[in-house]
């Protein structure tokens, strides 16, 4: 039996606020455009030959009630003015016949750039170690990125990140970021 190997993927993100945590999460999913799907969280493999679609094109592939596989990150707070972030990063190998990595990260107090770079770094490190590339945990992300690019084996990294500041009146604030696997 051959399993489902997605050929396409898209990134999405959203934020929701409500007095109830669950409703805040639902509103974040609605903001991301994926609330009408039955979401199944999967681990962090970017399939071989998978193509990243623009969000609008990917959304056309979804139907209400559809079982939909996602790599998703979420963060929530009801602490006023607290910065939260949810991010998913991807590292794509040059050889499209092998798999890459997706990584999810959620945090408090990190900007969009810091959280997004961290998710990319996680994905790139997982791919680099799979490919047998040099890995030095003491190097900065910029130094590692340069090594990976020079190796000519990792073609690109990117992320989708949603940040928000906790509601000033203490409502639940939830952020989500997702890689949605379709096709």
Language model segments and positions:
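Helix-coil modules at protein/domain termini and other flexible surface or pore-lining loops
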Residues: 1-183
């Amino acid at each position: 039996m051959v399993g489902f190997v997605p050929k396409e993927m898209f990134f999405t993100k959203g934020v929701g606020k409500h007095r109830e945590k669950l409703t805040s999460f639902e509103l974040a999913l609605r903001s991301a455009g994926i609330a009408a799907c039955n979401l199944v969280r999967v681990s962090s493999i970017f399939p071989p030959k998978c193509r990243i679609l623009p969000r609008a094109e990917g959304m056309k592939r979804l139907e209400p009630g559809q079982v939909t596989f996602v790599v998703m990150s979420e963060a929530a707070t009801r602490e006023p003015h607290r910065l939260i972030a949810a991010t998913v990063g991807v590292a794509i190998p040059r050889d499209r016949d092998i798999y890459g990595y997706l990584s999810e990260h959620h945090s408090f107090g990190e900007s969009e750039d810091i959280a997004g770079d961290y998710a990319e770094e996680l994905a790139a490190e997982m791919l680099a170690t799979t490919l047998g590339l040099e890995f030095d945990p003491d190097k900065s992300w910029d130094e590692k990125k340069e090594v990976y690019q020079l190796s000519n084996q990792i073609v690109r990294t990117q992320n989708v990140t949603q940040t928000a500041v906790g509601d000033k009146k203490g409502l639940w604030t939830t952020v989500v970021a997702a890689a949605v696997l379709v096709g």
